[in-house]
Amino acid sequence: MVTTLRQTDPDFEQKFAAFLSGKREVSEDVDRAVREIVDRVRREGDSALLDYSRRFDRIDLEKTGIAVTEAEIDAAFDAAPASTVEALKLARDRIEKHHARQLPKDDRYTDALGVELGSRWTAIEAVGLYVPGGTASYPSSVLMNAMPAKVAGVDRIVMVVPAPDGNLNPLVLVAARLAGVSEIYRVGGAQAIAALAYGTETIRPVAKIVGPGNAYVAAAKRIVFGTVGIDMIAGPSEVLIVADKDNNPDWIAADLLAQAEHDTAAQSILMTNDEAFAHAVEEAVERQLHTLARTETASASWRDFGAVILVKDFEDAIPLANRIAAEHLEIAVADAEAFVPRIRNAGSIFIGGYTPEVIGDYVGGCNHVLPTARSARFSSGLSVLDYMKRTSLLKLGSEQLRALGPAAIEIARAEGLDAHAQSVAIRLNL
């Protein structure tokens, strides 16, 4: 039975707080094993990759090679349905156009004292994109991670993807070429993260690593952080749908299940002010569950982590939605636009009944790599800015140094940093 929380219940706040703090995935204690893998790849390079690939992915990289060849990518295009390739091209183009609008501008100005200040944006030189293998090997994720890097001007985009039993998803290779990925390597797991961070004989190191993965990949990203940058540690997917009774229950149910089929730990939440509508949506979910290829996964997700929150009024939904800070927030109420300015915490907002979150997953243009597990309270989805860095600029002449120098000397001496003070004083003959 799906969890139901009623705002009218006297213990609602207690139950809601417990709901927010509930864990949806068990954190495996893999740090020791991962550290051993990372250290070995750092020491042994390619030979460690070959050994781990034999053990974990049952593939002999000495025969296949670590790098994916252009011929293999050509073959992937030949194997891919033309209609799917065209759909991926549409998605790529829309992602590119939207992310191009995020490009920041350099700024340089002269203040009233004649001091020149500014900031300059430059792209990271090389980034690594981790793509999971198996059922989570999605070409859309390749586009979402690689296209902002391309727009930002990253020179070298490196993709690593495991090849269990030697198999690679051809659509992942197609998406990589469409997005301008520079190099592809058939390695996965913590060993791939280590290779990207420290380099091997075959794989040159990068400056930042992005992309989702399992507990081993997440642990490896945490371990190498500092040597390289990372994007985020993503958790299971989630959606919050705020909907009134004028919606078609089947539509809302389909949107809830679109998240539930991702993962048994995914979470789908309906928030409404109408109990009869909530029941209709629950019934629609049960009907649709049996039509899905991933029925077992979606059923477990909905059973274990699905929720219906009944509010007295949609005015009450806004602070609750901000506390949930969902990865995806659908607003399907009469005046959806009026809600948007009042939402502070959400990874991405989907406005109105004709904007299912799935469009954002694929072809909307906005990025689908978003903060999960309430981290939208303090972080944002992937963007062009994740592949760029800002450098401050400052220029003084002798007059400006004379104007500002004495104050700098005073602060330096107050902090007990004599060399700091002398650095300015020596120029002013003080």
UniProtKB/Swiss-Prot annotation:
Gene Ontology biological process terms, A to Z: L-histidine biosynthetic process
Cofactor(s) annotated in UniProt: Zn(2+)
Domain of life the protein comes from: Bacteria
GO CC entries: cytosol
Active-site residues per Swiss-Prot or TrEMBL entry: E327 (proton acceptor), H328 (proton acceptor)
Annotated positions binding substrate: S237, Q259, H262, H328, D361, E415, H420
Enzyme Commission number, as recorded: 1.1.1.23
UniProt keyword list: Amino-acid biosynthesis, Histidine biosynthesis, Metal-binding, NAD, Oxidoreductase, Zinc
Enzyme class, UniProt record, top EC level: oxidoreductase
Pathway where it operates: Amino-acid biosynthesis; L-histidine biosynthesis; L-histidine from 5-phospho-alpha-D-ribose 1-diphosphate: step 9/9
Keyword check for Amino-acid biosynthesis: yes
InterPro entries in the cross-refs: Ald_DH/histidinol_DH, Histidinol_DH_CS, Histidinol_DH_monofunct, Hstdl_DH
UniProt: Zn(2+) binding residues: Q259, H262, D361, H420
Catalytic reaction equation(s): L-histidinol + 2 NAD(+) + H2O = L-histidine + 2 NADH + 3 H(+)
One Gene Ontology molecular-function label: histidinol dehydrogenase activity
Family per similarity comment: Belongs to the histidinol dehydrogenase family.
Function, as annotated: Catalyzes the sequential NAD-dependent oxidations of L-histidinol to L-histidinaldehyde and then to L-histidine.
HAMAP family, sorted: HisD
Name used for this protein in its record: Histidinol dehydrogenase
